[in-house]
């Protein structure tokens, strides 16, 4: 049986890196990053794990970059069976001061970019009558967060889009789900939580921030045959921050 191909965006660090490492050599792993150094990091990680795979540059806020990636993959006959939309950015500001580019950048990367990426790959999944699309959301989609109206709106949009896709694609054996992390120990949350770790932890019933591999384990489960009957869901992994 041929290996299934997994595409993970934002695979060089944090949750994306942990997701990559949660798979095994039964899969062909493709990771994306936004810089040459991140591509090298992904390739080094794939090699150290003794996986088969490759890495490519991708800026989800740049439509030409998305087109370049999909064209390159097609030329190499690489067709993702499992698409994991993990890459993301923050441009935090209260609405009163938020600039249009801060709003647009976050919506472009999280929502418009994912739409274009999914649209590029589902045709092959439909033809194969099998696929997995796993979108990384956030508790911000349901709780909101001061200074993150753009991020919360994008993540809520991703969850709504995923439910609609699950209805559209279910008859073709393509499952679409979201995983919504709470506060996880990553570079992105460090910017938010620096100096406030104890305060954040006090708001979480389990009393601590999560770890990237605790998100990755849920993602790899949703990508597996054990999750064949799960679609259209948002799985919250947040230590009880949102119930």
Where are these regions (language model features)?
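Conserved glycine-rich cofactor-binding loop
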Residues: 12-13
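Conserved glycine-rich Rossmann-like NAD(P)H-binding loop of the short-chain dehydrogenase/reductase
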Residues: 26-41
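Substrate-binding pocket helix/loop in short-chain dehydrogenase/reductase
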Residues: 94-95, 99-107, 189, 200
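C-terminal substrate-recognition "lid" of short-chain dehydrogenase/reductases
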Residues: 115, 122, 130, 208-237, ...
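Active-site helix of classical SDR
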Residues: 118, 154, 162
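Alpha-helical segment proximal to the catalytic Tyr-Lys
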Residues: 123, 167-171, 228
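Residue(s) in the substrate-gating loop at a strand-loop-helix junction
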Residues: 138
């Amino acid at each position: 049986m041929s290996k299934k191909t997994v595409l993970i965006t934002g695979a060089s660090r944090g949750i994306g890196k942990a997701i990559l490492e949660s798979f095994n050599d039964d899969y062909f792993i493709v990771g994306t990053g936004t810089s040459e150094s991140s591509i090298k990091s992904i390739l080094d990680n794939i090699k150290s794990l003794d996986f088969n795979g490759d890495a490519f540059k991708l800026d989800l806020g740049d439509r030409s970059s998305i087109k370049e990636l999909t064209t390159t993959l097609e030329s190499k006959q690489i067709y993702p069976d499992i698409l994991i939309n993990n890459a993301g950015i923050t441009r935090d500001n209260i609405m009163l001061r938020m600039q249009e580019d801060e709003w647009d950048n976050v919506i472009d990367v999280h929502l418009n970019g994912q739409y274009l990426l999914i649209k590029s790959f589902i045709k092959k999944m439909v033809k194969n009558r099998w696929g997995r699309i796993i979108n990384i959301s956030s508790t911000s989609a349901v709780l909101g967060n001061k200074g993150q109206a753009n991020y919360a709106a994008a993540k809520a949009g991703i969850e709504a889009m995923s439910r609609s896709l699950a209805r559209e694609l279910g008859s073709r054996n393509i499952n679409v789900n979201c995983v919504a992390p709470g506060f996880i120990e990553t570079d992105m949350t460090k910017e938010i939580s620096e100096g406030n770790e104890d305060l954040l932890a006090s708001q979480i019933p389990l009393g601590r921030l999560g770890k990237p591999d605790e998100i990755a384990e849920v993602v790899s489960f949703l990508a597996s045959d054990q999750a064949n009957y799960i679609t259209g869901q948002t799985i919250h992994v947040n230590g009880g921050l949102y119930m």
